[in-house]
Amino acid sequence: FLGNEILKVIGVQGIPTLALSRRPIVNLPSCADELIIDFNAISELEIQNINHLYLSLGYPLYFHNVMGFMSKVLKEDLFLVDFTYQLEIAKKAKEAGAQGISLISAVGSNSHSRNHYLKTKGMLESEIMELDFESINIYQPGHLRGNKSRPDILFADAISIFVDPFMFGSLSKFRSISAKKLAEVVASCLLYTSDAADERNS
């Protein structure tokens, strides 16, 4: 969902991109190539000439799951996708020469949180920081608006429109953001990173 939005923005900019996916991507930009992979075999993945990695994998959850109500199996599945897969991909990208990484995490992420979702996000952030990329962008958005395929998210979108204006000060970080807007922010950072790298190498 969010990854597709970022691909759209990057496509407009014409930035060469390699998109990793489980299945073929609809409306893939002409500047992008896709690589269909088995996420259970990331150790066998071979990629080259990567400059910047964007990570936005996330196990599909419902609101009550994010709030902490998860079965043991769901916790294991979440950890596998949100932590293990993403960390393995980050390490592969680093080996392939990636200088920068952009990670979509979550507001309130904390490796010491009692909330499994937020703890998992925080643990991944800590591990990514240890990989020593030259440029690390970690985004911690609140609720992401715009996923029209999920009725529960559409409901949350509507609630956000009324609640967001009342979130001031320390609460402002919990405001929702449209996936399209976040994608534009992420892509702008990628452009800035690319331009900075070109200047260093010129």
Model-derived features: where do they sit?
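Conserved Rossmann-fold NAD(P)-dependent oxidoreductase catalytic core, especially the SDR/UDP-sugar
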Residues: 1, 67-119, 130, 137-139
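N-terminal Rossmann NAD(P)H-binding glycine-rich loop of SDR-like oxidoreductase domains
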Residues: 1-11
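Short glycine-/acidic-enriched loop or helix-start segments at secondary-structure transitions
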Residues: 5-6, 29, 64-66, 112-114, ...
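Short beta-strand element of Class I
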Residues: 17
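N-terminal Rossmann-fold cofactor-binding loop
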Residues: 20-24
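NAD(P)H-binding glycine-rich loop region in Rossmannoid oxidoreductase-like domains
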Residues: 32-88, 92-95
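Single conserved hydrophobic/aromatic residue that forms the stacking wall/gate
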Residues: 192-202
